[in-house]
Amino acid sequence: FSDQTAVDGARIPTLEEVLHLIRRSGNENVRLNIETKLRPTEPELFLEPREFVSSLLKIIHQQGFSVRVTIQSFDWRTLQETQRQAPNIPTSYLTVQQDWYDNLLMGKPGPSPWTAGHDIDNYAGNVPEMVKKAGGQIWSAFHPEMTAEKVKQAHDLGLKVKVWTVNDTDRMEALIDMGVDGIITDYPDRLRGVLEKRGMPLPKQTPVSP
């Protein structure tokens, strides 16, 4: 991120502070895609999923954002727990199958520790089917792994498709052509430019300062 500007004294805001900022903007159409960060392979470093999700949902409910959030995670345990505690909140199932990170572990004995007991090999490698069976509404895949055929598979199952993390405008164009429902990017201004060029609907901008 060579073009970002450092700000002395800047710190990571709490979720509660972010929600307050959004409310101050006055734009009630702003939604949040909140990702939980747990590692089932290192349980000693994290809260137990039920406690983690309970704490997260408490803030969301207290601030009145229950209908304005989606919860996503590579650790499907937290998504299953969200579905138990707050079935009205959409869950987005993150997946990646790369040498540097693989949360599905296709072809390995037993289920991946990341997928809450679901084994991709029991679905013949069909990721959308496993996400649907797990109760997800959204499949969020690493964008190089997405194809038009996979988008159709997911849509036929009633799932929405989001991809991450797309920073190249040509790739954004290609994924839109495939029919994805959402794109996660580090550069929303680039994506906004692509959407504007294509004549697609754009959300209203509502700048607000902390």
Residue map of PLM features:
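C-terminal active-site rim and adjoining tail of enzyme catalytic domains
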Residues: 93-94, 101-210
